[in-house]
Amino acid sequence: MESDLEFSNIVSVLKLVEATTQRTVMAKALSSLLAKTPPQVIDKVIYFLLGSLRPDWEGVELGLAERLTLRAISMATGLPIRQVEELYKKLGDAGEVAKRAAEIKRSKGGGGTIFDFIDTGPKRRLTISKVYDTLMAIAKASGEGAQDTKVKLLSSLLTDAEPDEAKYITRFVIGRLRLGVADMTILDALSDAFDVNRDLLEKAYHVYPDLGKIAKTLAEGGEEAVKAIKVTPGVPIQPMLAERLSSPKEILNKLGGVAICEFKYDGERMQIHKLKDGTVKIFSRRMEDITNQYPDVAEYAREAIDAEEFIVEGEGVAIDPDTGEFKPFQELMHRKRKHNIKEAIEEYPINLYLFDVMYVNGQDLTDLPLPDRKKVLFSIIKPHEHVHHADWIITDDADSLEKFFLDAISSGCEGVMCKSVKLGSVYEMGARGWLWIKYKRDYKSELSDTMDLVVVGAFWGRGKRAGTYGALLLAAYDPDSDQFYTVCKVGSGFTDEDLKKLPQMLEPYKIPHRHPRVVSKMEPDIWFTPGLVLEITGAEITMSPLHTCCSVMLKGDVGLAIRFPRFTGRYRTDKRPEDATTVKEIFEMYSNQKKVKLTDQVP
Ligand code: ATP
């Protein structure tokens, strides 16, 4: 048993995490669990806690529909399928059904009684390896008869499971573990459990976002082994992010007087990898493998980039085939529907605008300054109808920057990205820093920018909105404390269609109490695990005693809130909750807004 861990240990932690509203309790439970986990299985424990068999970018899916899990529950417990389906109707959660069915089986003497336990002894107790390996076998079953194999494998696992174990295994299978245990939470727990510097782990995570691998490397090889984790084609790296400012002068000042400025295209960010064996993979901003949606772009990259192995980055933009003009971001949504990719490729062609290179033929370029990376990038792009370098200038003049910005806007772009060219202008993985600064059109409208906020609660609607949500409680992210702070209650901007689908979209995130990573003074009618990210605009940012956002910075009992918040209609499914606008950004927007007001008053 020493090289394995009884699954019940994980279940105890899951129960605790599910019940608590305190982040410290959750963090302590996770770190104690990891501290006592044998190195051989620490990766499996972490994948289970995160609710995913492998890191998301590997795209491993169990492929077992909820209906089939009910069949497995019926097989494992001997309850007739009709009874299991009735339980499902009543309880509405396959996990609870699995638990209830196992309890019924136990009450009928069908296993799990005290005698059973003595009979078969500890042999029958599930371990994490048994659970994980079986789930992996379920994911791998393919071809004819795969569904039956999957159901049988699951039912064999559930047969050996205690009621609570059955509940969490089933939730995992249907993708509803959703405990709000995020990558950052695990990094904290690892750093605490192994008493290692968190920055070291975070750095490795930026280079190789696979917490199972990082944990195992740490547990088996110590800090040195973690430091040796390298950029690897085929494994996405955490994208570099930009800060924002609202005037060319400020931007040039911040960047040391001169900058490379590029169009900020309104499409989908693509990190494109070519491996030695010729495979091309495309990863999204949140590092999901989106190659299947863009086989055309993968082919263009293969044709247009002259290197055996590479990692480059660019924006894929939908183009009007008749005019060659850019189409808005929403057009790319047609690519998300899995079935008619071929048609979508014809109807919605895409151009790729490259703006960075991070790796070429065995060499990690992320530590090179931007001008050096650009040289490499220009040297490997061959002329191609659909692949170009992003439109760019290098300038030290605010008027030229403003003119370039207006050009970008009139070409249908969102604005410009201004990038540092100084010696230290490395590719900063996973960081939102001042080496890249975005300057967008909507900076000049009401609020200085839209914000991407996380839904953490909802209030029932009345009148016309009876039966659906009247408003949502939204929060910003604080990476330092790994918590979400509320910043507004938003009820406007939702279409009838939005209102109809929101309860459905949010159903999987529903929890009975405030999530331990949410800091809120408000008490909504429904709480959610932070998951869904929405784009919000508003009139201004004001102080508010009702919200908790930035209350730490304001050092008082007041926080910051968005006045007249409105949903822009954009669901940011390309962002994880941890990619939402941060409290620090909101504080900066608030401070800038104050500055603008003061200068407005100068005669
Ligand atoms: P936003 O919410 O403004 O779209 P974001 O939060 O997704 O931005 P940011 O770092 O704020 O990410 O802005 C950078 C985004 O702009 C990138 O993710 C990328 O998709 C897009 N982009 C378009 N053109 C460029 C460019 N030339 N250089 C870098 N990023 C670009």
Curated annotation (Swiss-Prot):
Chain segments annotated as transmembrane: none
Underlying gene: lig
EC number: 6.5.1.1
Reaction equations catalysed: ATP + (deoxyribonucleotide)n-3'-hydroxyl + 5'-phospho-(deoxyribonucleotide)m = (deoxyribonucleotide)n+m + AMP + diphosphate
Function: DNA ligase that seals nicks in double-stranded DNA during DNA replication, DNA recombination and DNA repair.
Residues involved in ATP binding: E262, R269, R285, E315, F355, R432, K438
Keyword DNA damage: yes
Coiled-coil stretches: none
First-level EC class: ligase
Organism per entry: Caldivirga maquilingensis (strain ATCC 700844 / DSM 13496 / JCM 10307 / IC-167)
Name assigned to this protein: DNA ligase
Signal peptide: none
Pfam families cross-referenced by the UniProt entry: DNA_ligase_A_C (PF04679), DNA_ligase_A_M (PF01068), DNA_ligase_A_N (PF04675)
HAMAP family tied to this protein: DNA_ligase (MF_00407)
Similarity-based family: Belongs to the ATP-dependent DNA ligase family.
Active-site residue list: K264 (n6-amp-lysine intermediate)
InterPro entries: ATP-dep_DNA_ligase (IPR050191), DNA_ligae_ATP-dep_bac/arc (IPR022865), DNA_ligase_ATP-dep (IPR000977), DNA_ligase_ATP-dep_C (IPR012309), DNA_ligase_ATP-dep_cent (IPR012310), DNA_ligase_ATP-dep_CS (IPR016059), DNA_ligase_ATP-dep_N (IPR012308), DNA_ligase_N_sf (IPR036599)
GO MF entry, a single one: metal ion binding
Entry cofactors: Mg(2+)
